Amino acid sequence: MGKYNLILSEYLSFVYNSQSAVQIPIYYSSNSELEKRCIEFHAKCVDSSKKGLSLKSLFEEYKDVIDNATLLSILSYSYDKYNAVERKLVNYAKGKPLEADLTANEIDYENNKITSELFQSAEEYTDSLMDPAILTSLSSNLNAVMFWLERHSNDVADANKIYKRRLDLFTIVASTINKYGVPRHNEKYRYEYEVMKDKPYYLVTWANSSIEMLMSVFSHEDYLIAKELIILSYSNRSTLAKLVSSPMSILVALIDINGTFITNEELELEFSDKYIKAIVPDQIFDELQEMIDNMRKAGLVDIPRMIQEWLVDCSLEKFTLMSKIYSWSFHVGFRKQKMIDAALDQLKTEYTEDVDGEMYNEYTMLIRDEIVKMLEVPVKHDDHLLRDSELAGLLSMSSASNGESRQLKFGRKTIFSTKKNMHVMDDIAHGRYTPGVIPPVNVDRPIPLGRRDVPGRRTRIIFILPYEYFIAQHAVVEKMLSYAKHTREYAEFYSQSNQLLSYGDVTRFLSSNSMVLYTDVSQWDSSQHNTQPFRKGIIMGLDMLSNMTNDPKVVQTLNLYKQTQINLMDSYVQIPDGNVIKKIQYGAVASGEKQTKAANSIANLALIKTVLSRIANKYSFITKIIRVDGDDNYAVLQFNTDVTKQMVQDVSNDVRYIYSRMNAKVKALVSTVGIEIAKRYIAGGKIFFRAGINLLNNEKRGQSTQWDQAAILYSNYIVNKLRGFETDREFILTKIIQMTSVAITGSLRLFPSERVLTTNSTFKVFDSEDFIIEYGTTNDEVYIQRAFMSLSSQKSGIADEIASSQTFKNYVNKLSDQLLISKNVIVSKGIAVTEKAKLNSYAPVYLEKRRAQISALLTMLQKPVSFKSNKITINDILRDIKPFFVTSEANLPIQYRKFMPTLPNNVQYVIQCIGSRTYQIEDSGSKSSISKLISKYSVYKPSIEELYKVISLREQEIQLYLVSLGVPPVDASTYVGSRIYSQDKYKILESYVYNLLSINYGCYQLFDFNSPDLEKLIRIPFKGKIPAVTFILHLYAKLEIINYAIKNGAWISLFCNYPKSEMIKLWKKMWNITALRSPYTSANFFQD
């Protein structure tokens, strides 16, 4: 098993290195004889350690346990209380501590001053501007680095160079921290005033970022980039990331395309050997030079030099360095500003009368027409979703904050909560629920705010609107989104596509006579100038739609939606500033509405169309594509002559002038070869992604536990690695060791082993091999999985109490009654379960469940309870299949060119052999006929788990299920009697299995699973028609082959002779697979 357990035991002896420290390994086995020996071994170890005897002789005596059983966990005692970190740190603090430049940032508190200078007293103090928001501490991070350094101090050759580079960088960090002392965190991993008052305010978050960067250093270039960012980010907490990453928007326009991938008619990527010259007017070079000069002004030396050197020949080979700099710049950490500054940022824009009214008018009309186009069909057909919009809204109501804390009574229990779902229940119980009245957000009821922090940008504010806004918007927005789903212009929503498709779309139309215009419109979206035309466009669209229907319910839905827009035109926000809460009139559009994403996309599309229609007055061209993707829009324009420098310059200046006529402060660029938007950038005909996910600092604190955060950390590490930013894996594993340990008492800790953390159970945190998801099939693996399943679901007294209260029951019954035409236990129970699950975001419930889980886990990690579960997991299925496969060596040549240069070699190799995929595999069941049938008549959306359960019921029961959801009896019986139903069984099973196997996550999402090259490595003689069995056999074979290729860089072929007698058994088993939710799966989901 290896590496993790080895690091674990070494780490424990590194951290607990005093005389009194003891580490006792705990083993388990599925073999009952060996299990007895494991228990004896453990008992004797505990006994000896109590007497203070050495455990060496026991290790000899129980060699059979150590060799044949599986390590479950390590129990560690240490009576030595801390300051161990400080002692070790001194040895590394040999350099000169950094001194912060206290004039580096415009806003006073963004300067890295001593905390007591920024906050005079503990009452004034807030950690919100520097809170790492992660459940691990600076001292742990320091320990992890020092552990790595100690472990590698004797490395030779190239490894020694890496050691020296990291040691040098760590000396800077250690010396600076040592000067002030290591800040101690409290039990919530926060840094209080008492600890911070005599230390620089940003010390902790800076140190975390620096550690993350230095542990990602491999080459000399990495070292130079990291050194510069570490030193400068100590002072510059505001603009560093922006300065360093700005040039990229121009760099992408400088590289000739020599061969690229384009999307063909079948929406696949195919290679095209076209050559396109980068045509760059001098003006663009001047702008780039200005950016580089700004970097130098800010004290950067090496990074601007690297860019300058690259500019000499602008080669694609050396562009990886540019791409690296771009990714690294985000790892300086989040820019966290005070709410007041974030809000006033939007309000600083001066209103000018000198704007082009005609353009604004055109913009508004385009928004109006798009809204009408999106909603015309559902409105004319009196779509049931628009009629029952309120119910649909309630069913998908989130448990996020409603903006104010209220005292609520559930049965005999009185609680305080801000959660929307609880407020709705309470209001319904007390007759205060009036979804037909949208509360104003004017000066009398200003909007409370949330925040969004991103590296390299200013803090943005988020409206926390009353739940009535959500209910009013939900159904209409869902319809808008389903329109966007089949409209190519909306890159973000386009059906099942992924970013590779959008990439091929751009490169497809690039040629010597076309140019691409790309604009970052994030400033415009949140500007005051946008508000009136934007809201008015929506309102006008809704008015037109209201005239297209006679159904009072649909009209009511549209009117409520319109009311939300009217109210928001006159919006005030409340901002805490010190001890006072300021009310400010806020004239701009902010996130927080249900419509945010959809409406912004519509507005951005309208904006670029407005601009293009003006450009068309002056030039003659064909618009080949227009796309909007979040805050960015881009268009490819084809002219009737070859593009020249002068043309690029003219178009560029005209576009900028047109935007300025609308007072839009946006960054608009024109290029012939590449684009750069927030989500991805295309350079030299290849696609790149920014690997900018912070590992040791988080944006905000949620209610995830240390285990969840360990899984998220690993998941972030994987995403970065796929995008070309690699952090040392040993360091990541050390962090996982720290974050998954469980304290029993002050001096007793339990550290789970690799087997516990990598088996896919409810506790899975990471994969033992990066990019490869293994499903254990050995006896010990299945044994531990079963053991964990026995304690997966935890009860919460508070949740039970709330759920048994009249308030809760009435609410669930109200939903069921409105939704169902006749009794349907599955759905009613489903609603109750969903509503009860929403209570999890209420902290006391969460903590209670967590405590129960920890104590169960503690018992388990000391001795697993053998447990005969009747549940079947995906592991059981694969375990049944495995013995019938025979492996032989095979050969698969590299046949595709690289299009994503940042991929790790092993993943790149697999793609080059079998090809990539440009679509998401459907894993939600939404493509099945039963799902479409339900959505035709009901607002209820069953999950893939529920569909999987329902489709395997008896036909009579399926029919009742459908009828109760409002499907006409004749349709229901036709469905059950038709061939469609048996196709559905297969489709849903397929989706469910894909979902279980995380086929759309990690690096699996990049591989073409239907590649003929892959198929020809698999031979399965065809016996009997059970498509589901054939499917699972093939899928298993594909995963085996791909995993082997990732691991070994070589190919195998598989032959399977599956006995017919076993097929029917397997098929029955496949209808009882239990889904396992773990921190690992939720971290994957979190990436989405």
Curated annotation (Swiss-Prot):
Keywords: Magnesium, Nucleotide-binding, Nucleotidyltransferase, RNA-binding, RNA-directed RNA polymerase, Transferase, Viral RNA replication, Virion. Its cofactor is Mg(2+). This is RNA-directed RNA polymerase. It is found in: Virion. The keyword Zinc-finger does not apply. GO terms for cellular component: virion component. Residues 501-687 form the RdRp catalytic domain. It comes from Rotavirus A (isolate RVA/Human/United States/WI61/1983/G9P1A[8]). Interacts with VP3 (Potential). Interacts with VP2; this interaction activates VP1. Interacts with NSP5; this interaction is probably necessary for the formation of functional virus factories. Interacts with NSP2; this interaction is weak. Belongs to the reoviridae RNA-directed RNA polymerase family. Pfam families: RdRP_4, Rotavirus_VP1. RNA-directed RNA polymerase that is involved in both transcription and genome replication. Together with VP3 capping enzyme, forms an enzyme complex positioned near the channels situated at each of the five-fold vertices of the core. Following infection, the outermost layer of the virus is lost, leaving a double-layered particle (DLP) made up of the core and VP6 shell. VP1 then catalyzes the transcription of fully conservative plus-strand genomic RNAs that are extruded through the DLP's channels into the cytoplasm where they function as mRNAs for translation of viral proteins. GO terms for molecular function: nucleotide binding; RNA binding; RNA-directed RNA polymerase activity. It catalyses: RNA(n) + a ribonucleoside 5'-triphosphate = RNA(n+1) + diphosphate. InterPro entries: DNA/RNA_pol_sf (IPR043502), RNA-dir_pol_4-hel_dom (IPR042032), RNA-dir_pol_luteovirus (IPR001795), RNA-dir_pol_reovirus (IPR007097), Rotavirus_VP1_C (IPR022071). Its EC number is 2.7.7.48.
